[in-house]
Each structure stands twice: as structure tokens, then as C-alpha cells.
Amino acid sequence: DYPIVFALHGKGGKNTSWVNQLKSFTDSGEFVGIYPQGHLDSWNLGTEPSKADDVAFINSIIKELENYNNLNMNKIYAIGTSNGSGMVNKLGIHTSHFKAIAPVVSQLMESMPILDNTKPVSIFQINGAKDFTIPINGGSAFGHNFLDAYKSAELWASNFECNLSPEVKSINGTVSYTHLRAHETTD
């Protein structure tokens, strides 16, 4: 059975941007790629042009995918960039479908608290110090108040009862922080 990867475009973007980036993986059968298009080319995080219920939209796609017996509904993942990254965070908070999410170049926002009933999910949060669009140290952009990227990772970790003293690795100027639950490994 094939794992499923949702790939969400950024604000103003198109779902086709992910097709070519992930084509070699989907063509080789590593997973089935799902590339939804946000209404008005954005995902509704509160201040965007779209006021669509994007959580319901993604849930409806997942419900439809349940009709295919060659898909592994226990291995659903989501990756998104920028506005799509914010939507990936929202899906991680408001749904229980995802085994892991990868928000790229965004972090949690003050308006997006992790809920008590949020199902633990693996998070691969990517931020960059040279990204001047989304403030890595927190602050306002695009009508949102972003948390500091590291604080965002800590908030996920603390809500999912992970070790708050992360494993830190630095390779060629890139630093990774890994927060594990007691029974997890990085393998």
C-alpha cells in the first residue's frame, strides 16, 4: 500500500509547483502525491483572501482517498511552503489524519494554539535565518503574529511530551534540533 503525501503551495502559488518537485518520487512509486489548490491561490489562516474551510476541504479529500484499497491511510503526510506551511501546521493541530507534517519556512502563529486534544504528530519544521519573508525570530508579517521558530518547535515538543532538551547537530552552518518522545529514536 502506498503512503500519501499532501503538498501545499504558498500564497499566490499553484498546486503544479509541487508536481515537478516530487515527480521522481511519485513516478518511482514511493508515495502518492496529492496537490490540492487553495481557493484564491491561498490557504485560509485568517487574514488571507480565501475564507474557505480548508481543513474541511482536506478532510473531504482524505475521505475520498479511503475508497482506494491500495493506499495506506495510516501513512498520510503533509508538506507545505510559506502559506502552505501555515496550513500544514493547522492540519497538524485540527485533524488526526497525519503521521507527520513538514512546515517549510513558517512556524506556529499566536493565533494558532495547539489544542489539548491535538493528536501527537511528528513535525519536521524548517526555517532559515536568511528568509526575510517569515520572521524567524517571531513577529508580524502578512497580518499574522509568528512565534519565534525555536519557540514554535519547543511548543510542539512540550505539547507532545517530548524531551525539551533537544539533540543538537550542526553541519556546515545548518543547525538541527531534535526533540524526541521517550520511546522514539531518530532512525
Feature annotation, model-predicted:
Residues 97-106:
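A conserved short beta-strand
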Residues 131-134:
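Acidic catalytic loop of the alpha/beta-hydrolase fold
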Residues 125-127:
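Short beta-strand/loop motif that positions the catalytic acidic residue
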Residues 118-122:
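Short, proline-enriched alpha-helix->beta-strand connector loops that line the catalytic pocket
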Residues 179-182, 186-187:
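Single conserved hydrophobic/aromatic residue that forms the stacking wall/gate
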